[in-house]
Structure formats: C-alpha cells, structure tokens
Amino acid sequence: EKTKLIVKEMLDLLALDLVEKGLVTNQIVLTIGYDKDNEYHGEMMIDRYNRKIPKHARGTINLERYTSSSKLIIKEVIKKFDEIVNRNLMVKRINISASNVLYEDKVKDMIYHRQLNLFTNHQNINQKDEKEALEKEKNLQKATLKIKQKYGKNAILKGMNLEEGATTRERNEIIGGHKA
C-alpha cells in the first residue's frame, strides 16, 4: 500500500508538470523494479552489477484521450499497478514516464470517438459535465502551481502527501538527487 501511495504521488506530480509545461499525454509507462530476493523462484534477470534479481514489472497504460488530468491518469495507472505488481517482493525502484506527449493547443480540436455499448444508457453520459469537470481540475492545478512557485513546493500538499509512507515532502527538498 505504501508503494501504491508513492505511485499516486508521482503521478500527481507528473500531471502538474504536464500542466505547467502546457503538455498532454495519452500514454503512461509504469515500471516497478524489485530488490534482490534469494527466496524468489520466479523469472529472474541480471542487473548492471551482475546480480540476479526478480524481473521488473512493466505496464503501458493507453488513455482514452490526451489529458493532463491527475484524476484520470491516477485512476487508470493504479488499475494497471494492481495487475502487474508482485506484492510478495520488496519494491526498490519506481519509474513513471509520459509517452506520446503533445502541446495542449495541438489537441484542442481533436474529436474523440467513444465506442458504444448496447448495455449502457448513453443519454445519461453527459460529455459537457465531463468537460467542465476536467476544466475545473485544470484550473485547480494551475492555481496549485502558482502557489508552489510563489511559496515553495511544500506550500500546498494533498492529504495523501501527509500519510505514513508518503515521500513528496522529502522529494520536494531534494535538488538533483541530493538533500538541499
């Protein structure tokens, strides 16, 4: 659960980075690296130090549309995380990257098609409400960025950043991988 919390924090920061730079993505790649475990008898690989370690878990998440919404990104990536992670192994490394990144203004005019389902009441799906919710979230992300730029990265935190095992506060104080 601590690993899942850290993944959520990293995704939230990734979404904020996308908003800050005016970018959107439709694909996230999640890689989980495990610590060496002598008790593990599954698939192994050799690391750069020539040690046998459990093979890392990797998942590619294709989003329905280009987005920088942390809610949409977190929801989809956590689903994939639950599928690929081996809960019996200790996680040593988490890599998250956004692929297929475009500038936001290039995708504004894109038309998204949704596959219809015979069992869904399509009259209840209101795309206007969904679009307003995404716009509201983007405005909140922009306001968060302004506060962080003015008062520091730890000036505004989410509740998950205060939970036990959360690492955002410590990561915000690190510069280039070293404590400031």
Map each language-model feature to its residues.
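Basic, low-complexity intrinsically disordered segments
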Residues: E1-A180
